[in-house]
Design a protein with these regions (language model features):
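Alpha-helical transmembrane segments of integral membrane proteins
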Residues: 1-172
C-alpha cells in the first residue's frame, strides 16, 4: 500500500538515479532500456499484485475449490487448473491499462532526458527534440509524435475496456 502512494514517474526516476550511480555512463547507455523496463516494472507491480491477490482470495473461497480439495486434488493442480484461469481476466484487463501507463511513463522519462539515450528511438525523445523547433514554424516535428502517443495510449485503453466488457461475465 505504501508503494501505491509513490507516483510511478518518481519511482522510475529513483531507480534510474540509483542505476546511474552504480554503473558507469557507457554501461548505462547500453543497458538504458533494461533499466527503464525494470524501473517502470518496479513502479507498476503493486497494481498487479493487489488485483491478483484480491481475485485469488475470492476464487479460493468458492465451492469448486473446496470440492477439489476434498476429493484429494493437490494444491498445485487446484492453483493452476482452477484458480489461475479464473483470475486471468482481471489481470489481462489491468495489463492493458498497465501497458498504456508504461508507454506514457517511458515517453515522459525520455522527454525529461532520463529514459533511453538520444540515439534510441522514442516518442518522448522525438517530442523533446521537436520542442526546439516548435516556435520556428516547424510545429509538426512535435505534433505528430505527440498525437501518435495520445492515440496509442487511447487505443490500448479502448482495448482494455473492450476486454473488460467481453471477459466480465456479470456484464453479459
Amino acid at each position: 500500500d505504501v508503494q501505491l502512494t509513490v507516483p510511478s514517474i518518481l519511482m522510475a526516476l529513483l531507480v534510474d538515479g540509483i542505476a546511474r550511480g552504480i554503473i558507469s555512463r557507457e554501461m548505462h547507455d547500453e543497458m538504458a532500456i533494461y533499466v527503464l523496463i525494470f524501473a517502470i516494472g518496479i513502479s507498476e507491480w503493486p497494481q498487479f499484485a493487489r488485483v491478483s491477490r484480491a481475485a485469488t482470495l475470492v476464487e479460493k473461497n468458492k465451492d469448486y475449490v473446496a470440492a477439489s480439495t476434498i476429493i484429494g486434488v493437490s494444491n498445485l493442480v487446484v492453483m493452476f487448473k482452477h484458480i489461475l484461469p479464473n483470475i486471468m481476466r482481471p489481470i489481462l484487463v489491468i495489463g492493458t491499462i498497465g501497458l498504456a501507463l508504461a508507454i506514457l511513463a517511458e515517453a515522459t522519462l525520455s522527454f525529461l532526458g532520463v529514459g533511453v539515450p538520444p540515439t534510441t528511438p522514442s516518442l518522448g525523445t522525438l517530442i523533446r527534440l521537436g520542442n526546439d523547433f516548435l516556435f520556428s514554424g516547424e510545429w509538426w516535428i512535435t505534433f505528430f509524435p505527440a498525437i501518435f502517443l495520445v492515440l496509442l495510449a487511447f487505443s490500448i485503453n479502448l482495448l482494455g475496456d473492450w476486454m473488460r466488457d467481453t471477459l466480465n461475465p456479470k456484464l453479459n
